[in-house]
């Protein structure tokens, strides 16, 4: 019956005339009507909202004091919400602990800040999240096979996730919109398109998946979640969990789509191998998909491409330009033309894969080519995205639209296509224009055929043609309502507007040097009160001859060079004309915490690098933000405002002829970093010695003769590190044997870019250096007969560095030694026993502040040499050199002070490079105890490693450590330097006391020798 009903709906939607807006059913989850939705959009507390969100992950920036920086940058750009994954593994170091209290593990500050800043929250707690994170966010203790194949209704898996999911649901429930908070949706699972056996069109349900979803949904509801439950489709083929597609009891309230139309990785060859030829800027038809699969729900992207991750072996510095500002310009506008009214950009801020957070597909950086860079920089992509997000927040008519038509018939140039969407209630219309072949970057000009309340005609009527130059799109509006005024049309794009003292101020923009034309109903004449590189301004007053002959209108054509111009109409309306660069630095900070920002609850500010907030008290406006240099600032505010405070300092202010306020921002303080060094060092591989005693608390007998893992080893005992509670990074194996063995066959698996080295009785046998596209290595290592002892135990030492656990079904792929076979002339040699060491304390999580991802099993890590407060007085001096010969592992330390002044935001990165004659080494960068980067020059190209304040102590001493693992007898040589990414005058306090984030060394570490 559900099939027939759905087919009837889809047929009607695709071939009948558009329904009236009030004829579409308004849905809720039957628990309340606080969050509702229909065919057009979400509605929150009775108000429709264009949900433009961006994703970020608190666990990739584990400094709570910096979360406000990310949220303020999201808000300032015009976003109305943010998405956030909660990472089960980060909070559950073992199967008896769920930590939502220690340091950055406490997410409640984020949920409180969201309310204060004025952003809705799309909370995404998994339990599986993918996210290019180790095992997709599964705690690594569930990867052994002991909990089944995962992501089903297996009772063992259910028992694993329930404590975590119960706790996060309890926490989130207190911050829901229904209880006065700002959490508006709750995503169940992630990209779990497994509802159907075979084609979704057959609708034969896969019961283990459906029952799993029912368990998750019931748990959320039982623990207080009463907002809509959401699922996200991994692609346009899965069609799972949607009520418009089936009547399954496992369905959620609202379904969103995940789409990455450009390559999701900086390695374009990966996309070519998966989806065929990669064509940059090639768009996808989403309108038909949404109409067919979820016609009574909003067209909703739970994830839409915000960038691409950089894999091991990817290009230095990240992705090519086809994922930059032009991508944001074209693809996000394309989505508007597809009637999308809810988008979550993945990622808006990527952050860092510190410790062992990363899955094997990605290195330490999770910059993701995001609008906000890993080092917290905002640049061209952020500003280009802001041009649209400010518009979607201001364009109320955009929230309810029907697709009127699409094609080349709307343009005088066949090289241009147009999608026309119209609000059926207000007649506000949006013409989304782009190249007919979307991948084209030709320079095209055209007129647009529009149908307005004043009749049908082609625009511009007087000025120069509309221009699309390069990979660009433009949204041309007609009958655009703003305040009490209506824009009959504008070939310049609308940036934003606000209503001050009852009269709107409208901001329009064009690319630098281009022309625009706008027509305002009700105007008769206007004056140019500021002309900064403007030209060709013409005024054309006329009477409306169609709808109302008594209504006048004023049409203005112009060309705008670099700068800002201001025109004032006889109605009092101010129109601010901006070129692209000036629009980048034009802001509309809200005066209250309503995410939708009512039209009379913002001011307009031109000039600063960033405007974080605005508050008016009497005649004073208090602005906070960032400034890069001495620069002008201009504020459009209510007439009562006469005084500007910037970051709590009063500015010398003057008033313009068009009633704005002008002032100058001061130069930020000068900051210089001290030199790193001198360095001290110590050996960090005593385990390779034949007589090393592996009897401390660090070591466990690797003696399992069976495994729950679905992939059994070729030889026994089981030498899978996770079996013994060691899950991260470097693990050290010691295998004992007697007899006349001549070599060993080793198969080691550790994920893309992993590596290992082997020593026999202290002598190097060989190494696997790693490969960015290979997950395991099968080597035969011959023994030098002179190194084999015939009278005592021989010890084979394997140092194995994995790069994380695979995602999705690959989470159970073992990490460790899959085969260890001794070779001998008489085949009698066998290993007598094995010992293994990994993270100090194993799963007991002896460093709860930094958490379960931070450390591996290197001797230096187990002993705490990377931690502040460790006494290295007895170590050897290295001076400024970090180099040695021979196949070994050494650890280097230095302490360096910082004294960053207040009033500035400073971003710092470390730079690592190889020196000497070899790059066959692996290294880890530690900053005040945090592993902030893996530098593996044989495999990867990442050389820059940002470290945020809080991890760095900006007003005290900092302990910097580097492990160097030489995989050949040539040794290793590394250079460590650091640099300032930016210094900005800022309201953000980066000199806060973050000592609690940097717990120091204790003697407890001595037991893990």
UniProtKB/Swiss-Prot annotation:
Subcellular location: Secreted
Residues bearing attached sugar chains per UniProt: 28, 95, 247, 375, 406, 427, 451, 682, 740, 771, 784, 826, 883
Disulfide-linked positions: 266-319
GO aspect biological process, one term: polysaccharide catabolic process
Pfam families: BetaGal_ABD2 (PF13364), BetaGal_dom2 (PF10435), BetaGal_dom3 (PF13363), Glyco_hydro_35 (PF01301)
EC number of the protein: 3.2.1.23
Active site: 191 (proton donor), 303 (nucleophile)
Signal peptide residues on this chain, from the entry's feature table: 1-21
MF term (GO), any: beta-galactosidase activity
UniProt entry tagged with the keyword Calcium: no
One GO term describing the cellular component: extracellular region
Catalytic activity: Hydrolysis of terminal non-reducing beta-D-galactose residues in beta-D-galactosides
InterPro entries assigned to the protein according to its UniProt record, in alphabetical order: Betagal_dom2, Betagal_dom2_sf, BetaGal_dom3, BetaGal_dom3_sf, BetaGal_jelly_roll_dom, Galactose-bd-like_sf, Gly_Hdrlase_35_cat, Glycoside_Hdrlase_35
Binding site for substrate: 85, 130-132, 190, 260, 368
Tagged with keyword Nuclease: no
Family named by the database record: Belongs to the glycosyl hydrolase 35 family.
PANTHER family assigned: BETA-GALACTOSIDASE RELATED
Described function: Cleaves beta-linked terminal galactosyl residues from gangliosides, glycoproteins, and glycosaminoglycans.
Protein name: Probable beta-galactosidase B
Organism of provenance: Talaromyces marneffei (strain ATCC 18224 / CBS 334.59 / QM 7333)
Gene from which this protein is expressed: lacB
């Amino acid at each position: 019956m559900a099939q027939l009903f759905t087919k009837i709906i889809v047929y009607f939607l695709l071939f009948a005339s558009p329904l009236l807006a009030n004829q579409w059913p308004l849905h809720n989850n039957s628990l309340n009507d606080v969050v509702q939705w229909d065919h057009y959009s979400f509605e929150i507390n009775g108000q429709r909202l264009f949900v433009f969100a961006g994703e970020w992950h608190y666990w990739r920036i584990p400094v709570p004091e910096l979360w406000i920086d990310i949220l303020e940058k999201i808000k300032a750009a015009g976003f109305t919400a943010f998405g956030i994954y909660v990472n089960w593994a980060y909070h559950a170091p073992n199967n008896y602990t769920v930590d939502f209290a220690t340091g950055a593990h406490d997410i409640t500050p984020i949920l409180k800040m969201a309310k204060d800043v004025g952003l809705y929250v799309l909370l995404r707690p998994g339990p599986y999240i993918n996210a290019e994170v180790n095992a997709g966010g599964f705690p690594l203790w569930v990867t052994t096979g002991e909990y089944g194949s995962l992501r089903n209704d297996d009772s063992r898996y259910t028992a694993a996730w329930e404590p975590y999911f119960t706790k996060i649901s309890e926490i989130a429930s207190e911050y829901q919109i229904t209880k006065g908070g700002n959490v508006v949706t709750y995503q169940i699972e992630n990209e779990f398109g497994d509802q159907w056996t075979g084609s979704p069109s057959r609708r034969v349900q896969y019961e283990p998946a459906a029952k799993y979803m029912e368990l998750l949904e019931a748990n959320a509801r039982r623990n207080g979640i009463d907002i809509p439950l959401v699922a996200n489709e991994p692609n346009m083929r899965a069609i799972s969990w949607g009520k418009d597609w089936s009547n399954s009891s496992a369905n959620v309230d609202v379904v969103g789509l995940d789409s990455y139309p450009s390559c999701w990785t900086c390695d374009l060859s990966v996309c070519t191998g998966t989806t065929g030829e990669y064509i940059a800027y090639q768009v996808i038809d989403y309108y038909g998909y949404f109409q067919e699969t979820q016609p009574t729900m909003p067209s909703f992207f739970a994830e839409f491409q915000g960038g691409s991750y950089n894999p091991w072996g990817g290009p230095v510095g990240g992705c090519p330009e086809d994922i930059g500002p032009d991508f944001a310009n074209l693809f996000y506008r394309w989505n508007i033309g597809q009637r999308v009214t809810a988008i979550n950009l993945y990622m808006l801020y990527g952050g860092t894969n510190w410790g062992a957070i990363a899955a094997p597909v990605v290195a330490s950086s999770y910059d993701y080519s995001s609008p906000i860079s890993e080092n917290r920089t905002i640049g061209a992509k952020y500003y280009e995205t802001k041009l649209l997000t400010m518009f979607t927040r201001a364009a109320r008519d955009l929230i309810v639209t029907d697709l009127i038509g699409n094609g080349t018939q709307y343009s005088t140039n066949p090289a241009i296509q147009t999608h026309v969407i119209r609000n059926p209630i207000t007649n506000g219309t949006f013409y989304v224009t782009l190249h007919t072949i979307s991948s084209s970057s030709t320079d095209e000009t055209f007129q647009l055929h529009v149908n307005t309340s004043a009749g049908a005609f082609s625009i511009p009527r007087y000025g120069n043609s509309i221009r699309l130059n390069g990979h660009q799109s433009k949204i041309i509006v007609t009958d655009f309502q703003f305040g009490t005024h209506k824009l009959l049309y504008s070939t310049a794009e609308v940036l934003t507007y606000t209503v001050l003292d009852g009269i709107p101020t409208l901001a329009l923009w064009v690319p630098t040097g281009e022309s625009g034309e706008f027509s305002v109903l009700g105007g008769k004449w206007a004056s140019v009160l500021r002309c900064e590189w403007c030209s060709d301004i013409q005024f054309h007053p006329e009477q409306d001859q169609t709808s109302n002959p008594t209504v006048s209108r004023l049409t203005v054509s112009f060309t705008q060079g670099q700068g800002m111009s201001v025109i004032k109409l006889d109605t009092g309306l101010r129109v601010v004309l901006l070129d692209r660069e000036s629009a980048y630095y034009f802001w509309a900070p809200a005066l209250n915490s309503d995410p939708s920002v009512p039209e009379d609850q913002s001011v307009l500010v031109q000039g600063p690098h960033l405007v974080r907030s605005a508050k008016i008290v009497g005649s004073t406006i208090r602005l906070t933000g960032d400034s890069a240099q001495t620069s002008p600032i201009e504020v459009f505010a209510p007439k009562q405002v006469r005084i500007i405070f910037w970051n709590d300092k009063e500015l010398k202010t003057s008033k313009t002829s068009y009633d704005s306020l002008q002032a100058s921002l001061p130069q930020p303080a000068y900051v210089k970093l001290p030199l790193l060094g001198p360095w001290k060092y110590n050996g960090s591989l005593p385990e390779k010695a034949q007589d090393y005693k592996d009897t401390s608390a660090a070591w466990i007998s690797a003696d399992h003769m069976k495994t729950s893992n679905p992939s059994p080893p070729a030889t026994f005992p089981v030498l899978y590190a996770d079996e013994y509670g060691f899950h991260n990074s470097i693990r050290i194996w010691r295998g004992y044997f007697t007899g006349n063995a001549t070599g060993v066959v080793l198969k080691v698996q550790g994920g893309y870019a992993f590596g290992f080295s082997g020593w026999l009785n202290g002598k190097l046998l060989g190494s696997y250096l790693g490969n960015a596209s290979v997950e395991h290595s099968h080597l035969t290592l011959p023994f030098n007969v002179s190194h084999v002892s015939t009278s005592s135990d021989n010890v084979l030492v394997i140092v194995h560095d994995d790069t994380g656990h695979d995602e999705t079904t690959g989470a159970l792929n073992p990490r460790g030694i899959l085969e260890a076979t001794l070779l001998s002339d008489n085949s009698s040699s066998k290993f007598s026993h094995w010992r293994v060491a990994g993270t100090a304390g194993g799963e007991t999580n002896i460093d709860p502040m930094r958490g379960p991802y931070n450390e591996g099993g290197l001797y230096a890590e187990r002993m705490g040499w990377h931690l502040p407060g460790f006494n290295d007085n007895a170590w050897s001096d290295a001076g400024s050199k970090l180099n040695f010969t021979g196949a070994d592992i050494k650890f280097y330390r230095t302490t360096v002070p910082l004294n960053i002044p207040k009033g500035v935001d400073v971003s710092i990165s470390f730079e690592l490079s190889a020196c000497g004659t070899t790059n066959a080494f692996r290294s880890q960068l530690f900053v005040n105890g945090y592993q902030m980067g893996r530098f593996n020059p044989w495999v990867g190209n990442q050389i820059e490693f940002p470290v945020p304040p809080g991890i760095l102590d900006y007003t005290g001493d900092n302990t910097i450590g580097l492990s160097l693992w030489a995989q050949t007898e040539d040794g290793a040589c590394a250079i460590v330097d650091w640099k300032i990414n930016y210094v900005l005058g800022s309201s953000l306090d980066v000199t806060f006391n973050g000592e609690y984030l940097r717990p120091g060394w204790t003697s407890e570490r001595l037991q893990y020798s």
